[in-house]
A protein has these predicted regions:
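ATP-dependent carboxylate/phosphate-activation module, predominantly the ATP-grasp catalytic core
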Residues: 99-100, 105-154, 166-215
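Residues at beta-strand starts and edge strands
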Residues: 56, 99-101, 158-160, 210, ...
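Protein-protein interaction modules outside structured cores
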Residues: 1-21
Length: 305
């Protein structure tokens, strides 16, 4: 929530930053969270588990997942494997290949009026080492997804986050990606408030520059104590835009939505990738691993690749 401090917003305007809130706010558009519908509107071969694919491999995931983080996703390589791993509430779809892009889009009555694209370096098991917030457009993504938005979200005004592989939509969210909004430029959040309050988009970018969002992971099943003073010191390093702590010390571990491969501790947003990677390395010791609840062992912090 640190990004939103000091941004004036009318009391009657609600801007969703998570899928649970967006689902409640937009009953007419919340069908986009149904992955069967995302496939069907694009003519992709797909089906719920129980309907056998005609060819393998396929990609499998929950039909609905409002908590994200790649929960429940897997590749099914063969018919034999499919018979073993069928799961109620899951679907299969094509295993796509190509560039995986996360795109934030400002939309007015279904028409895209602003785009920003981000690509991630995957570590596996739903984890990403870092993300690059690109300055340049993605013409193929904007052409294909712009036409899809105009056909299927007419009447909707607000932010949309689209995840694509090779310009094919795999996820649609009725919100923006709040991980790196400070890298979009001064005045962006104020423009978001105006979009939701008045239905206008008037954000003007003098010049775009790329940014980077570097992720620090720990291990599942371990509680961590944060050295807040050290975190604040690193926030002041030149080239760092922000450091976000991505969990709550006072909440049970299982209450946090996390990827299968690790427990996300913090995010370093920066303008220089080398600076971000160095700050992550220095940040890791600020998270002291307490004893694991079952094994009684102190688990080492994962700092990326």
């Amino acid at each position: 929530m640190q990004y939103f401090a000091g941004v004036v917003c009318p009391a009657d305007v609600v801007i969703p930053t998570d899928d649970e809130e967006a689902y409640r706010l937009y009953p007419a558009e919340r069908w986009v969270y149904n992955k069967l519908a995302i496939c069907e509107t694009q003519g992709l071969e797909h089906g719920p588990h129980g309907i056998e694919p005609r060819r393998f491999p396929v990609f499998s995931k929950p039909i609905y997942n409002l908590r994200g983080m790649g929960a429940g996703t897997t590749v099914i390589a063969s018919r034999d494997e499919y018979e073993r791993v069928q799961t109620p509430g899951h679907l299969w779809m094509p295993l796509l290949d190509g560039e995986h892009v996360s795109s934030d889009v400002a939309v007015v009555d279904g028409t895209p009026v602003w785009w920003r694209h981000t690509t991630g370096v995957a570590l596996g098991d739903g984890m990403f080492d870092y993300w690059t917030v690109a300055a340049e457009p993605r013409p193929a993504v904007e052409a294909y997804c712009g036409e899809w938005l105009s056909r299927h979200l007419r009447g909707y005004t607000g932010l949309v986050n689209l995840e694509t592989i090779d310009a094919t939509i795999i996820e649609c969210h009725l919100r923006f990606a709040d991980q790196w909004v400070d890298l979009y430029g001064e005045g962006w959040l104020e423009s978001v408030v105006e979009l939701y309050a008045d239905g206008r988009w008037r954000f003007h970018e003098a010049a775009r520059r790329p940014g980077y969002s570097v992720v620090l992971f720990g291990c599942h099943g371990v509680r961590y104590r944060i050295d807040g003073e050290r975190v604040n010191e690193l926030r002041r390093v030149p080239g760092v835009s922000s450091i976000q702590i991505t969990f709550h010390e006072d909440r049970p571990l299982e209450m946090h939505a996390m990827p299968p491969g690790g427990f996300r501790l913090a995010i370093v947003n920066c303008w220089d990738l080398a600076v971000g990677l160095l700050v992550r390395e220095r940040l890791a010791p600020a998270f002291r691993a307490l004893q694991a609840p079952d094994a009684g062992l102190v688990t080492q912090v994962i700092g990326g690749e």
